[in-house]
Amino acid sequence: MNIAIRNPVVARKEEGSLQVALDPDLKIETAKVFAVYGKGGIGKSTTSSNLSVAFSKLGKRVLQIGCDPKHDSTFTLTKRLAPTVIDALEAVNFHSEELRVEDFVVEGYNGVMCVEAGGPPAGTGCGGYVVGQTVKLLKEHHLLEDTDVVVFDVLGDVVCGGFASPLQHADRALIVTANDFDSIFAMNRIVAAIHAKSKNYGVRLGGVIANRSAKTDEIDRFNDAVGLKRLAHFPDLDVVRRSRLKKSTLFEMESSPELDAVTAEYMRLAETLWAGAEPCEAQPMKDRDLFEFLGFD
């Protein structure tokens, strides 16, 4: 069977961008699916990769899908920049039946399977369309049938119809944030996007992961106000920076009391999510209300 690479809009000019038409029938039915969002640079790839390892250490079969054109979501798992789905398809002129699994799937640390969706050139195309084609390709090769957990690591805090497309496939959306104004402001916008998508899809907010923060007071105050909950807290430790430079997950770093506490927190988070995190019925604030709500030390 071929993947139908078709233009999802009725027309396209010489210059401009495609918009994605989401397919409500394209579902991942055999795995628990999590989509990880958050402000750009907040540590979503670090969080996603270490969470994937934690799931794998629970004995689960894990697939991580990077949804950023930079295709750097999984490098701490694979120790290299993995080939992207879009590059693999272009190499065979989009004849997907010519692709082998190893052309676009890389096995990473502790058996985590890694896929980088990639994306169109900057300023053209729709990244969400690429995500949809990635899921179709994985289904065509029956890879999702042998998977227990799928983790989507999603570009920045972009909540357009395209990069919101992983929400079509997800059971729970997780938001990574720090204890600062900009991160929480971005989180509120993501809450609004997920709230809108939940009207048409089964995705629900799973909760908040506090990252790179010594304290969580502002996060907790915001959560209480809108109806969110904090699932985990990871402080800003130098070992995290060093793990990225070593192209390694935290589970591969030399043991220390502070590192052991972090990996234990990842294991606890994975256990909580696998057991079934209750959805959060959060209501986002209006931007001006949030501006007045935050800060004022």
Swiss-Prot record:
Keywords: 4Fe-4S, ATP-binding, Bacteriochlorophyll biosynthesis, Chlorophyll biosynthesis, Iron, Iron-sulfur, Magnesium, Metal-binding, Nucleotide-binding, Oxidoreductase, Photosynthesis. GO terms for molecular function: 4 iron, 4 sulfur cluster binding; ATP binding; metal ion binding; oxidoreductase activity, acting on iron-sulfur proteins as donors; oxidoreductase activity, acting on the CH-CH group of donors, iron-sulfur protein as acceptor. The keyword 4Fe-4S applies. Its EC number is 1.3.7.7. Pathway: Porphyrin-containing compound metabolism; bacteriochlorophyll biosynthesis (light-independent). InterPro entries: NifH/chlL_CS, NifH/frxC, P-loop_NTPase, Protochlorophyllide_ATP-bd. ATP binds at G41, I42, G43, K44, S45, T46, K70, N211, R212, P235, D236, L237. It is an enzyme of class 1 (oxidoreductase). It catalyses: chlorophyllide a + oxidized 2[4Fe-4S]-[ferredoxin] + 2 ADP + 2 phosphate = protochlorophyllide a + reduced 2[4Fe-4S]-[ferredoxin] + 2 ATP + 2 H2O. Binds 1 [4Fe-4S] cluster per dimer. Mg(2+) binds at S45. Pfam families: Fer4_NifH. Its cofactor is [4Fe-4S] cluster. GO terms for biological process: light-independent bacteriochlorophyll biosynthetic process; photosynthesis, dark reaction. [4Fe-4S] cluster binds at C126, C160. The keyword Iron applies. Homodimer. Protochlorophyllide reductase is composed of three subunits; BchL, BchN and BchB. Component of the dark-operative protochlorophyllide reductase (DPOR) that uses Mg-ATP and reduced ferredoxin to reduce ring D of protochlorophyllide (Pchlide) to form chlorophyllide a (Chlide). This reaction is light-independent. The L component serves as a unique electron donor to the NB-component of the complex, and binds Mg-ATP. Belongs to the NifH/BchL/ChlL family. This is Light-independent protochlorophyllide reductase iron-sulfur ATP-binding protein. It comes from Methylobacterium radiotolerans (strain ATCC 27329 / DSM 1819 / JCM 2831 / NBRC 15690 / NCIMB 10815 / 0-1).
